[in-house]
UniProtKB/Swiss-Prot annotation:
<keyword id="KW-1133">Transmembrane helix</keyword>
<comment type="subunit">
    <text>Homotetramer.</text>
</comment>
<feature type="transmembrane region" description="Helical; Voltage-sensor; Name=Segment S4">
    <location>
        <begin position="97"/>
        <end position="117"/>
    </location>
</feature>
<dbReference type="InterPro" id="IPR053681">
    <property type="entry name" value="Hyp-activated_K+_channel"/>
</dbReference>
<keyword id="KW-0406">Ion transport</keyword>
<feature type="transmembrane region" description="Helical; Name=Segment S3">
    <location>
        <begin position="72"/>
        <end position="92"/>
    </location>
</feature>
<dbReference type="Pfam" id="PF00520">
    <property type="entry name" value="Ion_trans"/>
</dbReference>
<feature type="topological domain" description="Cytoplasmic">
    <location>
        <begin position="118"/>
        <end position="125"/>
    </location>
</feature>
<keyword id="KW-0472">Membrane</keyword>
<dbReference type="GO" id="GO:0005249">
    <property type="term" value="F:voltage-gated potassium channel activity"/>
</dbReference>
<comment type="function">
    <text>Voltage-gated potassium-selective channel opened by hyperpolarization.</text>
</comment>
<feature type="transmembrane region" description="Helical; Name=Segment S1">
    <location>
        <begin position="11"/>
        <end position="31"/>
    </location>
</feature>
<dbReference type="GO" id="GO:0008076">
    <property type="term" value="C:voltage-gated potassium channel complex"/>
</dbReference>
<keyword id="KW-0633">Potassium transport</keyword>
<keyword id="KW-0631">Potassium channel</keyword>
<comment type="similarity">
    <text>Belongs to the potassium channel family.</text>
</comment>
<feature type="transmembrane region" description="Helical; Name=Segment S5">
    <location>
        <begin position="126"/>
        <end position="146"/>
    </location>
</feature>
Length: 209
């Protein structure tokens, strides 16, 4: 890879981070029903169009195409791109948006890209923190979608994030509880996933000793 290609790759990585965080901010702000919701959706379109370009660019220049799809990070990008294309086709043919909940589900798929941030840092403590943050964040987004409008205690993203965090960390104050079966399942699987991750980390640490 020559100097020009390395510079382009670096620029792509920086833009990828910027657009990923745009999606994160967009989702959080959307839970407060802002008057600029349409603007957020337009910004999301720009971000996801960049992700689509980035995915095609990476796939085009990789030598081993089969190995490309064995990488979990590329699979995440593929899911995001396919979901975006399907949603765009639906909007084009129906001439109308499908609703904020569908848009937020698409945003959550994009949030899976947070997982890729772990590649940027080799510090194990920071990797563990980013992993936990990713689990809590995505679970919070799902909780907000299924519980908002049903659960009077969950009115915005912060309420959902607070509830998810204390549930996953098993603190569980009990001041906020899920009201829907979907919400309960999300918390159950999130806690089980978190605990299984702790067990795996402990097993690796013991083997290392």
């Amino acid at each position: 890879m020559n100097l020009k290609d390395r510079r382009l790759k670096k620029i792509m990585e920086v833009l990828s981070l910027i657009f990923t965080f745009e999606i994160v901010a967009s989702f959080i702000l959307s839970t407060y029903n802002p008057p600029y919701q349409d603007l957020l959706i337009k910004l999301d379109y720009i971000s996801i169009m960049f992700f689509t370009f980035e995915f095609i660019y990476n796939f085009y220049y990789v030598e081993d195409k089969a190995k490309f799809f064995k990488d979990i990070y590329n699979i995440v990008d593929a899911i995001v791109v396919i979901a975006f294309l399907l949603y765009s086709l639906q909007v084009f043919y129906s001439k109308a948006f499908l609703g904020l909940r569908v848009i937020n589900l698409l945003r959550i798929l994009v949030l899976l890209r947070i997982i890729k941030l772990r590649k940027l840092e080799e510090n194990q403590a920071l990797i563990n923190f980013l992993t936990l943050l990713t689990i809590c964040f995505i679970a919070s987004c799902l909780i907000w979608i299924v519980e908002s409008g049903v659960n009077p205690a969950i009115n915005n993203f912060f309420d959902a994030f607070y509830f998810t965090t204390i549930s996953i960390t098993t603190v569980g104050y009990g001041d906020i509880t899920p009201k829907t079966d979907a919400g309960k399942l999300i918390i159950i699987f999130s806690v089980l996933f978190f605990i299984s991750g702790l067990i795996t980390s402990l097993q690796k640490a013991l083997k290392g000793d």
